[in-house]
Amino acid sequence: MIKSVVLIMFGWSIVYAVPKTVPQNTNIVKDTFTLYALDAQMRHKYYQAFTFFDELYKQTSEKEYIYQSLQMLEQSNDIKMLSKHTTDALNKFPDDEVLQRYKILVLLKEGQYAEASQKAFIQSEKSQKFADYLLYAETRLKLGDYAGTVEALKKAYTLNYDETTADRIALIKYAQLNQKSEAIKFLKEHIGIHGNSHILGKRLGSFYADSGELDRAVLIYEETYDAFKEQSTAEEALKIYIYQKNFTKMTTLLEKSQLNDPLLLDLYVQVKDFDKASSLAQKLYEREDNPLYLAQSFVFKYEGASNRNDPAFISEVVDGLKRANLELEEPLYLNYLGYLMIDHDLNVTEGMGYVKRALEKQPDSAYYIDSLAWGHYKLNECVEALRLIKQVESMIGIDEDEVRDHLRAIEKCKTKEK
């Protein structure tokens, strides 16, 4: 919970045992043992770090090292040792505020919440300092006194209006005291006066969403994302747009946040924005080296083209799809490539080979059978073409324009052949 009642440690690491011979020069002692202590701390060897800081205090008599040694005992979760050394330190410095906080912390860890609360109250009333109000709030929270927790947090909040305390006040009001409107009002006022933050904007958005005010929720999520560029906030906005099926807003959000490019690609395809879809698929291919995206890039390039009969353009698309299908072996793209070659008379036999590979994987696909029928038609093999297109008709009917056009053309081919 609250662990800011002690001094914040810096740290980096190398691990050594305490030397048996202590250097006599005070500066050498401090520098050497400080390095040892920081090394142990960064390696999460907290008891070892404690021994170094404890030795530093013995060699220098600087009270700072008492605080740091106690912090290491707290980090090691050795409550018994923490209690003993806190008591020893208080015997030497009974009026020390930091040591009094450690005493309260020990009581909390021992589960003596009422005594901890009593001492924390006296300490906070006496010092009227931020850390003591936070510690008192923690004791009230342990006792389940949510109203008392909020009151203590408010006293801390008025000293510096920090966002973490504001967030805790709002969360307890909303979740524990059921003061939902007050919690929302409090956060709005804080943001209006002291400015927004990633934490508070996301919290306010979650309150709105939980209350069913999705438009307000997504607005604050978007504003917070625009200000701080935190992806998790964009994710919350995206969830709402997905729920609302607001594809336009979803697309705009995904474009600026780059949160989910595969989803953005799907959205481009849904609205038939094939130019953007092709560019994005190419970007995804370059980033992930996935041949699926290479295939999609050329499919969308073809679908979005204004002149599909340009020989150079068709050749570019076919070559791209061939490259993709070297690794991909997906029936959808094998058939697409094969049909493209058949329809544009670019080596019809080779195109039929791609279609047959697709049919090996999905032999009951009416669309792949239709492609094969069209290949036989292009080769003037009208009997086989008619047999296949009639099979397609029996499977899916002729409601689709392309199937109906193929059937009519092949029936004429059959008639002509007679």
Regions found by a protein language model. Give the residues of each.
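N-terminal leader/linker segments that initiate helical-solenoid repeat arrays
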Residues: 14-87, 91-98, 118, 411-418
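Alpha-helical repeat scaffolds
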Residues: 20, 49-54, 79-91, 113-125, ...
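Short helix-capping/linker turns of helical repeat alpha-solenoids
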Residues: 28, 60-62, 95, 128, ...
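Amphipathic alpha-helical repeat scaffolds of TPR domains
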Residues: 28-32, 63, 259-262, 289-305, ...
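Alpha-solenoid helical repeat scaffolds
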Residues: 34-35, 64-69, 98-105, 131-138, ...
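Register position in tetratricopeptide repeats
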Residues: 42, 72-76, 109-110, 142-143, ...
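Solenoidal tandem-repeat scaffolds enriched in leucines and small polar residues
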Residues: 127-235
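Alpha-helical adaptor scaffolds
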Residues: 299-311, 321-360, 371-375
